[in-house]
């Protein structure tokens, strides 16, 4: 059922006659073309060319929803700052937002006017940052800039501390009157929230890395003066590099 033809390099190419016989019988393929194609061997298939999809076909405006749970201690701040949160999400990102009183979730939904695919993710990150304890003005940077991220970890992830030892570690991160935390924020250009034993950092990837290293050193017992010197040296090297 199959024919074998030897080419110049000595390799044997195998071609099937079944499909060609049917096409010959139907008159769709002339005898000469079939014989030449048979002698040449199997032809490589061409890559398909697909046109780019329009935004309407990518699912924009089809009612995608993101839900951000709100803990009880953030109800009052959310109510007081609702218009500051509502305005940029609705006017700039063209999304719909509401607070569901039954499920205690902030629900963000796309609509027919939504043009940007990443708007829903930006809005959800913005609301999440506020719920974690960041100021609205700081959290707004997540909407304006694309290279900002949120990172969260616990003190016990760095060192398994309990009782007074855990309290002292948290106090070392904050410093007297918040001095240590503010110094780390200013040098690394980040924003830090201390919520009990949880630590939330907002900033660019490289700056988050510097702030996280400084906080971990404080938890592990390094004196604050040494930590200040280390992060200032790292920050100056990074500034020279860029």
Curated annotation (Swiss-Prot):
Q: Which domain of life is it from?
A: Eukaryota
Which is an annotated GO molecular function term of this record?
A: RNA binding
Renumbered to this chain, the Low complexity biased-composition regions fall at: 27-40
Q: Which GO terms describe its cellular component?
A: nucleolus; nucleoplasm; nucleus; small-subunit processome
State the Gene3D superfamilies in the record. K Homology domain, type 1
SUPFAM superfamilies reported in the protein's UniProt record: Eukaryotic type KH-domain (KH-domain type I) (SSF54791)
Q: Where is the KH domain?
A: 158-215
Write out the GO biological process terms: ribosomal small subunit biogenesis
**Positions of the UniProt region annotated as Disordered:** 1-53
Q: Which UniProt keywords apply?
A: Nucleus, RNA-binding
Where would you find the membrane-spanning parts of this chain?
none
Give the location in the cell. Nucleus, Nucleolus
* Family named by the database record: Belongs to the PNO1 family.
Its annotated function is as follows:
Positively regulates dimethylation of two adjacent adenosines in the loop of a conserved hairpin near the 3'-end of 18S rRNA.
Query: Could you tell me what this protein is called?
Result: RNA-binding protein PNO1
Lineage of source species: Eukaryota, Metazoa, Chordata, Craniata, Vertebrata
Gene (name only): PNO1
């Amino acid at each position: 059922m199959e024919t074998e033809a030897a080419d110049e390099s000595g390799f044997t190419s195998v071609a099937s006659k079944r499909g060609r016989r049917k096409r010959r019988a139907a008159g769709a393929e002339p005898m000469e073309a079939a014989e030449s194609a048979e002698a040449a061997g199997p032809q490589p298939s061409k890559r398909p060319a697909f046109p780019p999809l329009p935004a309407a076909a990518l699912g924009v405006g089809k009612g995608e929803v993101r839900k951000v749970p709100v803990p009880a201690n953030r109800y009052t701040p959310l109510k007081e700052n609702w218009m500051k949160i509502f305005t940029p999400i609705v006017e700039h990102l063209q999304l719909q937002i509401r607070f569901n009183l039954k499920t205690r979730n902030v629900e963000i939904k796309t609509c027919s006017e939504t043009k940007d695919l990443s708007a829903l993710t930006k809005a959800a990150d913005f609301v999440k940052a506020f719920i974690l304890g960041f100021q609205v003005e700081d959290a707004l940077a997540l909407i304006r800039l694309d290279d900002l991220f949120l990172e969260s970890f616990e003190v016990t992830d760095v060192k398994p501390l309990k009782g007074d030892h855990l309290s002292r570690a948290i106090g070392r991160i904050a410093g007297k009157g918040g001095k240590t935390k503010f110094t780390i924020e200013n040098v690394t250009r980040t924003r830090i929230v201390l919520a009990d034993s949880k630590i939330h950092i907002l900033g660019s990837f490289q700056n988050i890395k510097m702030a996280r290293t400084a906080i971990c050193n404080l938890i592990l017992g390094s004196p604050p003066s040494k930590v200040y010197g280390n992060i200032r040296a790292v920050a100056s090297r990074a500034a020279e590099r860029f």
